[in-house]
Amino acid sequence: MPPFIPKSRSNAVESVYLHGWVRDMLLESKTSQNIAVIPRVDPDEASIPLLSRRIYANRRHFVKITKFFQVHNYSVYASVKDSQHQILSQFTPKCVSEFESRNRSRITSDTVNTLFMIGDAKLGIMVVDELRHYFGEKIVSLFNGLDMPYIPYLIINQAFILDYDQVEAFKMTPFVYQYI
């Protein structure tokens, strides 16, 4: 007999900070590249983000890291998610350096499924061959059959840990690319 899930539990959320924004962001910026999509976070506000109305008001500041793919020339290539979709991303060398000196640990060390606050991010695009190089063949296979010559990804220049709990997703979160 399958487990009984009460109606109140069927809409459970992983975090009150995660909201669906990735798909809308991509639809808004479909015609442009290298545009700023997430504003910079003042480091003083980042130390107590829950008291900052400016940070909390922008849903795009909050993501979870779902997987790390590769480190290349001090950039870290990963996938991040909101409450509904995943998107490929690059943590820039500046972001990685600042994160690691502030936290005294590697950005890739025990941070999968950790809630992050990000800032100073823009949207970039990559051709499939570049994608294969940075994210691997498995990711490229996701784009077979999609009519997308360029794949958008998030370029993140600021990252702060908001919550160290590594709560796994209740359900599989799909990549956003088939929905745009």
From Swiss-Prot:
It comes from the Eukaryota. GO terms for cellular component: chromosome, telomeric region; telomerase holoenzyme complex. Pfam families: TPP1 (PF10341). One of its GO terms (biological process) is telomere maintenance via telomerase. Belongs to the EST3 family. Component of the telomerase complex involved in telomere replication. Stimulates RNA/DNA heteroduplex unwinding which favors the telomere replication by the telomerase. InterPro entries: TPP1/Est3. Component of the telomerase complex. Keywords: Chromosome, Nucleus, Telomere. It is found in: Nucleus; Chromosome, Telomere. It comes from Candida glabrata (strain ATCC 2001 / BCRC 20586 / JCM 3761 / NBRC 0622 / NRRL Y-65 / CBS 138) (Yeast). The keyword Nucleus applies. This is Telomere replication protein EST3. GO terms for molecular function: DNA/RNA helicase activity; GTPase activity; telomeric DNA binding.
